[in-house]
Regions:
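Aromatic-lined carbohydrate-recognition surfaces of secreted/lumenal glycan-active proteins
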Residues: 4-15, 101-111, 172-176, 233-276, ...
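The substrate-binding groove and active-site-proximal loops of carbohydrate-active enzymes
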Residues: 8-21, 65-85, 136-153, 227-244, ...
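Active-site-adjacent "subsite" loops/lids of carbohydrate-active enzymes
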Residues: 10, 15-17, 81-86, 90, ...
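Catalytic domains of carbohydrate-active enzymes, especially glycoside hydrolases
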Residues: 24-65, 161-170, 288-293, 362-372, ...
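Aromatic-lined carbohydrate-binding/catalytic grooves of carbohydrate-active enzymes
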Residues: 34-83, 110-120, 180-190, 194-233, ...
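Hydrophobic targeting/anchoring helices
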Residues: 46, 55, 180-183, 262-433, ...
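Carbohydrate-binding surface patches
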Residues: 411-412, 417-436, 472-478, 482, ...
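Helical hinge/lid and interdomain linker segments adjacent to catalytic or ligand-binding clefts
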Residues: 431-516, 520, 647-656, 668
Length: 669
């Protein structure tokens, strides 16, 4: 079988290239990479690159904050150069000679006229009101000019001119262009709030909040708190409708000139979190023709910057969820590789972790009714400047390891998701602080070594006899619930199941999390009854979703905490009813991912979650051939006394610290 096609994208500043070179440094850049990527998103950074576009009649220098992000001085290779509009147009032409797609991207932050008189200084009404950063920090793409013109109706026509004149192949909507920042702290500006008041009905907001407040960050903050606590659903719906309208216009404008669009998912890690906290319902974007969804799965850089917990499990499950709910977009995974401005470099400071995280992110699967497919259509290197030839070679090795095989079947079980559960989940979350659905398989993978890396939809769940894990069973429609309960193979339900109409012969774990909230883990089709109750000191106070949630990048959303004992008991119960794990020591910080291709070859990824070398005690049959597919270890591996080992097995086979080993296993027969 041919390998599933995958795309390789690079997001980079102009610092990756050389405007003084005859070909703008394109050949040297490609030679350094050692491959030709599918596409490059050219980070021109300043939104004024579009808003203050001067055309192509004359040559002129581009703003310093176009030539380098925020106008910073240099990267490892060169100082910021003085690019002109003609230079950049030439760069696009040179990249096209290699059949590379070239998209353009900008950010929303302003620099207070540091390098030029900015559009926002001429139109202060488009500033994004933010209770953390103040009013004069960024441009709001959902704003309105004082004459009533929507910002998007200025930006998109100018974007069309920029894309056509420079020869770009599309627009990459980066951070802040959908979704924006967290609804609990933006947009609190007069312009946006007054439009919301019209949408809501002016009489519903107290008169004090209909007064201008742009002069006072304290007044803006108080007004936003009131809206968040009293009109959260309406606030989120209004904001989402604005984003969907903007993206609908952008898609039409780009497609009309035979160009494409890519949308970022910064900050918002899942469908539900985006609906509730960021005011963008991705489900409404699925049908408007967006070509690419760039999932900002920056697990390595987040873990390095913020610590606390592993993010690879959450982000991996999120990618699977996004693929299932948004089937009409290509899903591109974005690992955070390095960034001069944000001051991190996973290639040099955490290469093992980067290798592991890219593999885990891109190798989530979706079952389509006949077989499993890789959920990711490709990956994007962020950012792609200042990388040495040796580092590019390592990135190519990671790609070959991660995309080098096709999946026919994946994991210990599948998990179920559907667009229909997110509306009732909003109400459930407000009442109980319910954990979003993608976090259930993530927690079980992280803490119980259950490989739940394949997702499916209700219409396909009867086409497999693999065990099926159903988080939030209680939120499905009666029709889908009936379909789930009628399955013949092992089915694992989680959620509030008191009145779910479950059969009597089930195995069940229960844990009371609140006065009127008991969480169940119920196993169907096991043949006998078993019940275990996990004691819990649940809080006396009801869950409160209203406090401002600020640390959306570094923390998970507020939720009712579930005792580890519940997941331990659930994991033990599930494992006792499925095949035993070949990994004998998950307690040593090791997890596994297993895949099967169409030739019956088993692919095994062993992932470390410790900062030291770890030995994975992994059972392999003696009558098989084992082939190492990861860069490390450097010597062959084989079976010694039934366990994976080095050929010279006097020394143990080490997993790299927070790294990965990938092997495939072929039966000799």
């Amino acid at each position: 079988m041919c390998k599933q096609a995958s795309e390789t994208w690079i997001w980079t500043e102009l610092l990756a290239f050389d405007c003084d070179s005859p070909d703008c440094g394109v050949k040297a850049y490609i030679d350094r990479m050692g491959f030709v990527p599918t596409g490059i998103s050219c980070l021109t950074s300043a939104v004024d690159f579009v808003l203050l576009y001067q055309g192509m009649d004359e040559e002129y220098e581009l703003f310093p904050d176009v030539c380098a992000r925020f106008g910073h001085n240099r990267n490892e290779e060169r100082e910021r150069q003085k690019w002109t509009n003609f230079d950049l147009r030439k760069l696009v032409k040179e990249l096209h000679k290699y059949n590379i797609k070239v998209f353009v991207s900008v950010f929303i932050l302003n620099l207070h006229n540091k390098y030029h008189e900015e559009f926002v200084s001429l139109h202060p009404e488009i500033r994004l009101g933010d209770k953390r950063y103040g009013l004069d920090n960024a441009v709001s793409f959902l704003s309105c000019l004082s004459d009533g013109t929507l910002f998007e109706d200025i930006f998109i026509p100018n974007l069309v001119k920029v894309v056509k004149d420079y020869g770009f192949d599309g627009w990459h909507g980066a951070d802040g262009t959908g979704p924006g920042w967290n609804l609990t702290h933006s947009d609190s500006s007069d312009g946006f709030v007054f439009r919301f008041a019209e949408y809501l009905g002016k009489e519903k907001l107290p008169a004090k909040y209909l007064q201008k407040a742009d002069h006072s960050e304290e007044a803006m903050s108080e007004r936003l708190d009131y809206i968040w606590r009293n009109f959260r659903n309406e606030w989120a719906k209004f904001t989402s409708d604005c984003w969907v309208r903007l993206w609908g216009k952008a898609v039409k404008a780009m497609h009309d000139i035979n160009c494409e669009v890519m949308i970022n998912s910064p900050f918002a890690k899942s469908i539900f979190e985006s609906i509730f906290y960021f005011g963008l319902d991705y489900r409404d974007l699925n049908d408007i023709g967006i070509d690419y969804l760039l999932t900002e799965s920056v697990t390595t850089s987040c873990s390095l910057n913020y610590g606390n917990y592993e993010r690879v499990f959450d982000f991996s499950a999120m990618i699977a969820e996004m693929r299932a709910i948004l089937p009409k977009m290509k899903v591109i995974v974005m690992p955070g590789v390095k960034d001069v401005v944000e001051s991190y470099d996973a290639l040099r400071h955490a290469p093992c972790r980067l290798e592991r995280d890219i593999f885990a992110n891109v190798n989530q699967s979706i079952f389509d009714g006949s077989r499993a497919h890789r959920a990711a259509d490709g990956h994007l290197i962020c950012l792609g400047d200042g990388i040495s030839p040796e580092e590019w070679h390592h990135l190519s090795e990671i790609k070959e390891m991660s995309f080098g095989f096709d999946t026919e079947k994946a994991g210990d079980m599948m998990w179920l998701i559907s667009p229909e559960i997110f509306d009732p989940l909003v109400r459930e979350y407000e009442s109980f602080g319910t954990m979003p659905p993608y976090q259930f398989p993530a927690v079980l993978a992280e803490t119980q070594n259950l490989d739940i890396s394949c997702v499916t939809l209700p219409q396909n769940m009867d086409k497999t006899d693999q065990p099926l894990f159903v988080p939030m069973f209680n939120l499905y429609s009666d029709e889908v619930k009936k379909q789930i309960l009628n399955r013949r193979s092992l089915t694992i339900l989680m959620g509030r199941l008191e009145d779910a109409g479950l059969p009597e012969n089930i195995k069940c774990i229960k844990c009371r999390l609140a006065k009127d909230y008991t969480l169940f883990c119920a196993l169907l089709n096991t043949g006998d009854y078993e019940e275990k109750i996990i004691p819990s000191d649940f809080p006396a106070e009801k869950f409160d979703w209203r406090p401002t949630y600020l640390k959306f990048i570094s923390t998970r959303i507020p939720r009712t905490e579930i005792p580890a004992e519940f997941f331990n008991a659930a994991g033990e119960l599930i494992r006792s009813n499925i095949s035993p794990s070949p990994l004998l020591n998950p307690q040593d910080g090791v997890t596994q991912m297993r895949f099967y291709d169409s030739d019956g070859v088993e692919w095994v990824a062993l992932l470390s979650h410790r900062d030291t070398y770890t030995v994975a005690r992994y059972q392999v049959p003696a009558d098989c051939r084992i082939e190492k597919k990861s860069p490390f270890p450097y010597s062959p591996v084989y079976s010694a006394d039934g366990l994976l080992a080095l050929a010279e097995h006097r020394s143990p086979l080490h997993l790299p610290p927070r790294g990965i080993i990938l092997i495939n296993i072929r039966k000799n027969s």
